[in-house]
Amino acid sequence: MSENSFHRSDRPRQRVVITGMGAITPIGIGVEAFWDALVAGRSGAARIAAFDPAAFPTQIACEVKNFDPNSVADKKEARRLDRALLFALGASAEAIKSAGVDPTKVNGDRCGVVIGSGIGGIDTFEKQLHILFDQGPGRVSPFFIPMMIIDMSAGLVSMKYGFKGPNFATVSACATSGHAIADAVRLIERGDADLMVTGGAEATITPAALAGFCSARAMSTRNDEPERASRPFDVNRDGFVMGEGAGIVILESLEHAVKRGAPIIAEFLGAGMSGDAYHLTAPSPHGEGAARAMKTAIADADLTPADVDFINTHGTSTDLGDICETEAIHSVFGEHAGKVVCNSTKSMIGHLLGAAGGVELITCLKTIQTGTIHPTINLENQDPKCDLNYTPNTAVKRPVRVALSNSFGFGGHNVTLAVGAYQRNGGR
């Protein structure tokens, strides 16, 4: 048994499977559109359209395009909801439909929702703040607080489908979705729920958020070449590109999924969490915290490093982050590190912050389903300090049985999720 207390294979727990997926991303609305664009190596980066970015050092982002709010809520309700909430509703609807869940035929008391957001309704916050200062407090919307608070995605999804089981949100910056999914898994494993809707949603391409990240010098300023700006593990990377969207999955106990004849996409194998206790925004030296998260996920899944075929990296295109993650992978996998195939979804969709982990877990699931590993685009001159196989520029075909998804957030929050091909007589 691992010495890490989070490894619990000695305790009885139910097997957890993934039966549905939903995605709203800068390169496609819907899982299949998203996946096709990933495999094709298509970037979602462009000059910001939501507002005039001329005054900002960074003027580019990966915005969700052609999203119709009225496709997920009626016109009156859509006006009362923040963009992040609309993304959560849209991705959840796709996930529930793809899982074949009929809310009237499941026990709502045993179905729950855990959906997180790293920042929440900042677009609503900024707009209402302008109203407050320009028009006075009496003009602030009565829906301001419900539109803004992070837990409302979970609340709205539960209300829409009548899911009355565990219902809450997670907040851990860029690790938010990973923590939401890990928490949802634990609830099923210990018998507190049969089915969970989980993941994350984010919509932070706003003037204040952009200004804050620009002041932190965290983002790329390659404004003349937006499609080439996000370049994880490349020697010429100069920061991340902000994205937006949502990624939601349906988790079920194996027993519940089999009983209702659900389509089983993959099995959830393990989760690992750790804290850096080091710095507000920088990773711990040599990726020590990230390494502990990966080690714990592997142990929690009752696997060895040699069992892992693929890692969807956090891969943000920041100088220190990419190096530290590479060092962490070397630390965990040793000689096997060179045999593990990696990639970065953020090279195409940018950094979805609190929604990143949900969308990137879907990347892992599609990789297992299709045996295709999408490319890390813009990897033209690989950093010698980033010396792994990151699938540069062209997708490759390769069977993947076990995949890891890494998410690391400001504040030293680290989470790794392990998923694998479903085997009827499997288990840990």
Question: Where do the protein language model's features map onto the residues?
Answer:
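Acyl-CoA/ACP chain-elongation machinery
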Residues: 192-238, 271-285, 315-323, 339-389
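Conserved catalytic cysteine-centered active-site region
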Residues: 3-13, 47-90, 96, 110, ...
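Phosphate/pyrophosphate-binding loops at sites that engage ATP/ADP/AMP, CoA/4′-phosphopantetheine
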Residues: 95-107, 257-264, 294-310, 332-336
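Flexible, low-complexity linker/loop segments at domain and module junctions
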Residues: 1-18, 103-108, 301-307, 337-338, ...
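Glycine-/small-residue-rich "gating" segment that lines the acyl/pantetheine channel
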Residues: 134-141, 179-182, 186, 195, ...
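Short, well-ordered amphipathic alpha-helical segments that serve as non-catalytic structural scaffolds
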Residues: 88-99, 153, 180, 252-254, ...
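ACP-dependent fatty acid/polyketide chain-elongation machinery
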Residues: 2-77, 99, 255-267, 362-376, ...
